[in-house]
Amino acid sequence: MIKNIVLSSGVMRGYSYVGVLKSLTKNNLLNDYENILGCSIGSIFSLLFVLKYTAEELEAIIPKIDTNIFRDIDYTKIIEFPSTYGLCDINKIIKVVDILIKAKTKNKDITFKELYDMTDKNLIIVSTCLNKWKSV
């Protein structure tokens, strides 16, 4: 039994999480976990795991997503990084995530509590406060 799953950051690593999902499913381990923790792209895939997206669904969806939204870095924002909270346009990412959430829950604004009540899985998202340089 797996109690915790941790998915880390790195856009290219995100593609490998489809393989992780396949392996967990094949070995009947996906229903047993209690907590899933993600950071950056890992947080998006953690959400998709909790929403019960299958590897086959993700293999069909991912090629349709303009993955440049995860690599579309405006390097002129480096100086503004602490106030803009990132180098990518978060609004483009939010649009994609909203569609994926709504497809499974019918509610793009679902709360963590509602998601837990629906799935019995704890979704934990980790990020760093750039002003205080600590995890939040």
Language-model regions, residue ranges each:
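Short, Lys/Arg-enriched, disordered terminal segments
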Residues: 1-2, 114
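Patatin-like phospholipase
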Residues: 2-104, 135-136
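A generic local structural motif
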Residues: 23-25, 109-112, 124
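Short, structural beta-strand-to-alpha-helix junction motif
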Residues: 100, 104-119
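Active-site gating loop/helix substructures
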Residues: 118-136
